[in-house]
Design a protein with these regions (language model features):
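Glycine-rich, anion-gripping cofactor-binding loops and their flanking helix/strand elements
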Residues: 80, 215-305
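Conserved thiamine diphosphate
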Residues: 66, 113-160
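Glycine-rich beta-alpha junction loops
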Residues: 102, 166-172, 217-219, 246
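Thiamine diphosphate
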Residues: 30-104, 274-277, 282, 286
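Hydrophobic or amphipathic alpha-helical targeting/insertion segments
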Residues: 78-79, 85-128, 157, 161
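Conformationally flexible catalytic loops at phosphate/diphosphate-handling active centers
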Residues: 146-149, 153-208
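Short, small-residue-biased leader/transition segments that mark boundaries at the very start
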Residues: 2-8
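Glycine-rich phosphate/diphosphate-binding loops that line cofactor/substrate pockets in enzymes
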Residues: 10-18, 60-65, 151-158, 197-212, ...
Length: 306
């Protein structure tokens, strides 16, 4: 079943270990506020005035040395966050700014108090995303991606605030959802990260029964890369997908552009051969495998190498 964007945010905050929330309760952020107040993993602080709440969160984040959430209702209430958000940006303090919003279709139509909140903090946040209203599975996956992208920027090459705008047509105050689906957390792994983090990935490769490496478009492929692919293929018994535009020659390589056309392969058959891990690199992938795998988002791990 589909979950609202506020639930999507809540569960990803937990995955990232962000559990301190400074709340300025209003009508539009009721679903988020109530859901975290009822969750024992969250630490909630009520500060009615949004400007004061922002500065309180800034000090709290500095004291805890970890990100803190601020949440408010829609419209001009969001403008009160401006001073503390600017302060957090220039001090490099990680704050998750959650602004509830109204139906985007009603912008400029004399909707009560409605203002344009998309990207409102502009160059004073490290990342700003505007969530979709969730009506189907694709909306849900898109929402998950945007929340992950925002939270990852809290501490990527520096620290600072991020902005997540949460539009809604109306808010659900029935609170009758008992369980939520497992959520996906994005991880970023860099060459200079600890050996322990890299060993975790190695262990996953060892345990995986099906590994697929997809080679995207590339104009120059070094002999070292081709040798590495051959070694990886032999060591992990993986499948390697290459296309004409990949410009990679591997004896055991598969051209999935030929055998994975969505017009001829039904989802049921794709699911039978779904990999445990997909590792992709290079440029664009022309094969219909992208469209096929999107139907099973969350059922396998995807490692993007850049």
């Amino acid at each position: 079943s589909l979950v609202g964007s506020e639930m999507c945010i809540r569960d990803r905050l937990k995955k990232y270990g962000i559990t301190h929330c400074v709340l300025s309760a209003g009508s539009r952020n009721v679903p988020f506020v109530h859901s975290i107040e009822e969750d024992p993993e969250f630490h909630c602080y009520s500060v009615v005035d949004e400007r004061s709440a922002g500065y309180f969160a800034l000090g709290l984040a500095q004291e805890l040395n970890q990100p803190v959430v601020i949440s408010c209702t829609s419209s001009t209430a969001t403008c009160n966050y401006w001073p503390p958000v600017a302060e957090a940006f220039y001090q490099g303090v990680p704050i998750v700014v959650l602004t509830s919003d109204r139906d985007p279709e009603m912008l400029g139509q004399w909707e009560d108090q409605m203002i344009d909140q998309v990207g409102m903090y502009d160059r004073h946040v490290r990342k700003s995303v505007n969530l979709p209203i969730i009506n189907n599975h694709d909306d849900e996956i898109y929402c998950q991606r945007l929340v992950n992208e925002a939270l990852m920027e809290l501490n990527h090459h520096g620290t600072g605030p991020v902005h997540i705008n949460v539009p809604m047509k109306s808010y659900n105050n029935s609170f009758n959802v008992k369980t939520l689906p497992e959520v996906t957390k994005f991880d970023r792994l860099c060459l200079d990260d600890s050996d322990a983090l890299w060993k975790e990935k190695i262990e996953k490769l060892k345990k995986a029964k099906r590994i697929l490496v997809t080679c995207g478009q590339g104009s120059f492929v070094s002999s070292a890369l081709q040798e590495s692919l051959n070694e990886f293929f032999k060591k992990y018994n993986s499948a390697v997908s290459v296309e004409y535009m990949s410009n990679i020659e591997i004896e055991e390589g598969l051209n999935l552009n030929v055998c994975m056309d969505a017009r001829y392969v039904i989802p049921k058959k794709v699911k039978e051969f779904l990999p445990d891990i997909v590792i992709s690199f290079g440029g664009n992938i022309f094969a219909g495998i992208k469209e096929q795998f999107r139907k099973f988002a969350g059922e396998f791990e995807h490692w993007l190498v850049q």
